[in-house]
């Protein structure tokens, strides 16, 4: 029930990764990267499908060898989500996956080779209508920039990015997006701010090598949150040393928190105290797992007592306010029923699913009316 975020997004050029629009006001795409061996086709396909199920818009796959490129061909045939091939060192691999229908090429110009090799990749991408992501990383800056700046700085990342943007401009190729990633939050944020002022191309956001599931999520939320709140960013990846599925979940959580893009349930829950009338923590944890399949955007407040419960319920799609033995259930700000505290999880799950079904049907009717 909360309004859309009052964020003025940076104007950027529109490109497409497969059928996913990027830039020019398109929804911010959430992506992840497989961590299986690409040559293990079955494992990689299974992981990509798991990422699709939790809402991944785009999936990146590392293609380090020609054997991996041959595996990529088989993988591409078995999945629906657009795939980005991550290419380093050997430009010929980029040419090979282009033959196999890759949706986007991610190259690091600092290690892909000389200008002639970059030209060959760009010409191939142009012929096959494949966009490119220029991926600049603080950990792999060109040697001359390392010597010039002494260490990774925002200016160094910007210069690296602009060097390769200018190269693509000279080749008259504009179907690309750019990233300037670093593991340091402030370095990454300032680099993106500088780049956003220099080009109109879409920007792919990320805090690279952010860390484990908890620390990486925190660093990404801070870094990406700062940029997104300033209107910077057209696609994002939360990089975690964890199951890639968690990257998608955290990515959507960041967008939901900023009210930029909603998918699934936004749970609002109190941290609990001695006033709670039912097990709030257990209820929230159980419902988050049980309701992962719900993609309908809605706010659900679960508050253990009457101090803040009614106020949160007023601005939630569904809200529960703790009471003695039974807790009040609100729908769209109106108190509707009381739920047994001892059976809270089952009852609330049923109410949420029913509400999601009603909302989905209402949206379906609205779409049909627009199409008429």
Curated annotation (Swiss-Prot):
Binding site for [4Fe-4S] cluster: 270, 273, 305, 312
Catalyzed reaction equations: (2E)-4-hydroxy-3-methylbut-2-enyl diphosphate + oxidized [flavodoxin] + H2O + 2 H(+) = 2-C-methyl-D-erythritol 2,4-cyclic diphosphate + reduced [flavodoxin]
Entry's cofactor comment: Binds 1 [4Fe-4S] cluster.
Domain of life: Bacteria
One GO molecular-function entry: 4 iron, 4 sulfur cluster binding
Enzyme class, first EC level, given as a word: oxidoreductase
Family, per entry: Belongs to the IspG family.
PANTHER family assigned to the protein according to its UniProt record, in alphabetical order: 4-HYDROXY-3-METHYLBUT-2-EN-1-YL DIPHOSPHATE SYNTHASE, 4-HYDROXY-3-METHYLBUT-2-EN-1-YL DIPHOSPHATE SYNTHASE (FERREDOXIN), CHLOROPLASTIC
Protein name (record): 4-hydroxy-3-methylbut-2-en-1-yl diphosphate synthase (flavodoxin)
Annotated source species: Citrobacter koseri (strain ATCC BAA-895 / CDC 4225-83 / SGSC4696)
